[in-house]
Amino acid sequence: MKLTCVLVVLLLLLPYGDLITNSYIRGAARKVTPWRRNLKTRDVCDSLVDGRCIHNGCFCEESKPNGNCCDTGGCVWWWCPGTKWD
């Protein structure tokens, strides 16, 4: 029973290992993790319409220097201010 509980806990925490562990290895910053890359490409700021990055009802204007998450090439941050992730 104890072994089963340990395995269940490990399986639940395994996908979130990058959130739990330190983001630096031997003083060097780690590269973008698959978890964060997946979040960027799949779920956040998934379309650029009229210079605005649209996601979950939020938008970031191109002309706004503060909190801007978009440019003409698309999203430049992995989150937009005002989304459900804030």
Curated annotation (Swiss-Prot):
Propeptide segments, given as residue ranges: 20-42
4-hydroxyproline modified-residue sites: 65, 81
Entry keyword Ubl conjugation: no
Residues with 6'-bromotryptophan modification: 78-79, 85
Organ and tissue specificity: Expressed by the venom duct.
Subcellular location: Secreted
Post-translational modification: Contains 4 disulfide bonds.
InterPro entries: Conotoxin
A Pfam family reported for this protein in Swiss-Prot or TrEMBL: Conotoxin
Record GO terms (molecular function): ion channel inhibitor activity; toxin activity
Domain of life: Eukaryota
Signal peptide positions (record): 1-19
GO annotations of cellular component type: extracellular region
UniProt keyword annotations, A-Z: Bromination, Disulfide bond, Hydroxylation, Ion channel impairing toxin, Neurotoxin, Secreted, Signal, Toxin
Function (record text): Mu-conotoxins block voltage-gated sodium channels. This toxin reversibly blocks voltage-gated sodium channel in cephalopods, with no alteration in the voltage dependence of sodium conductance or on the kinetics of inactivation.
Family that this chain belongs to: Belongs to the conotoxin O1 superfamily.
Free-text comment about domains: The cysteine framework is XII (C-C-C-C-CC-C-C).
Protein's UniProt name: Mu-conotoxin-like Cal 12.1.3a
Lineage: Eukaryota, Metazoa, Spiralia, Lophotrochozoa, Mollusca
